[in-house]
From Swiss-Prot:
GO biological process, one term: translation
GO molecular function list: structural constituent of ribosome
Family to which the UniProt record says this protein belongs: Belongs to the bacterial ribosomal protein bS16 family.
Pfam family, one: Ribosomal_S16
Organism: Parabacteroides distasonis (strain ATCC 8503 / DSM 20701 / CIP 104284 / JCM 5825 / NCTC 11152)
Statement: the UniProt record of this protein carries the keyword Signal: no
Keyword Ribonucleoprotein: yes
Gene name as annotated: rpsP
Domain of life per record: Bacteria
Keywords, comma-separated and alphabetical: Ribonucleoprotein, Ribosomal protein
Entry-linked PANTHER family: 30S RIBOSOMAL PROTEIN S16, SMALL RIBOSOMAL SUBUNIT PROTEIN BS16M
Region (Disordered), start-end ranges: 158-182
Protein name: Small ribosomal subunit protein bS16
Length: 182
């Protein structure tokens, strides 16, 4: 039977996530499958992959053909490298201990690079949030200055109006008093 390792779409419109399945190549994309070996969520950063490593390796060894995207996923998870190393052991290029040592070194390096990417992304997010906060503080400061200036203008206008009314009221009171004195 011609088997494929393929993605089976789930989720909703605009927010797809996938099951990684072993299926007959003649079956429809989201139809019947032989075995589910993992899931893939491209909506997270970095994309989340939950994979049964041993079963994926088994199916690759018995001849299941991965699709392009699943080949990239399996390669990123190290399944393709492990298969390659095990084929080298079968051919006698090196022993199984050396193959396992190479795989563990690759895995450690891969995990370190993924961790560095996550740290870089989180640092960039923190820097962006800090920059937004500073910009907001500057904008609030500018708004506060404008409001204070308007309040000062209103207070000055009110004081001028009060002084004008007081000046108008004082001569009016004095004028009748001087007329009556004559």
């Amino acid at each position: 039977m011609a088997t494929k390792i393929r993605l089976q779409r789930h989720g909703r419109k605009g927010y797809a996530f996938y099951q990684i399945v072993i299926a007959d190549s003649r079956a429809p994309r989201d139809g019947r499958f032989i075995e589910r070996i993992g899931s893939y969520n491209p909506n997270t950063n970095p994309a989340t992959v939950d994979l049964n490593f041993e079963r994926a390796l088994y199916w690759l060894q018995v001849g299941a053909q991965p699709t392009d995207t699943t080949r990239n996923i399996l390669s990123r998870e190290g399944v393709c490298l492990k298969k390659h190393l095990l084929e080298g052991v079968k051919k006698g290029a090196f022993d199984e201990a050396a193959a396992e040592e190479k795989f563990q070194a690759w895995l450690k390096n891969k995990q370190a690079s993924v961790q560095a990417i996550k740290e870089k992304d989180s640092e960039a997010a923190r820097a962006e949030a800090k920059a937004r906060l500073e910009a907001e503080k500057e904008a609030n400061k500018a708004k506060a200055e404008i409001v204070a200036k308007k309040k000062a203008e209103l207070a000055a206008a009110e004081a001028a109006k009060q002084a004008e009314e007081a000046a108008a009221a004082a001569p009016a009171e004095e004028a009748p008093a001087t007329e009556s004195a004559e």
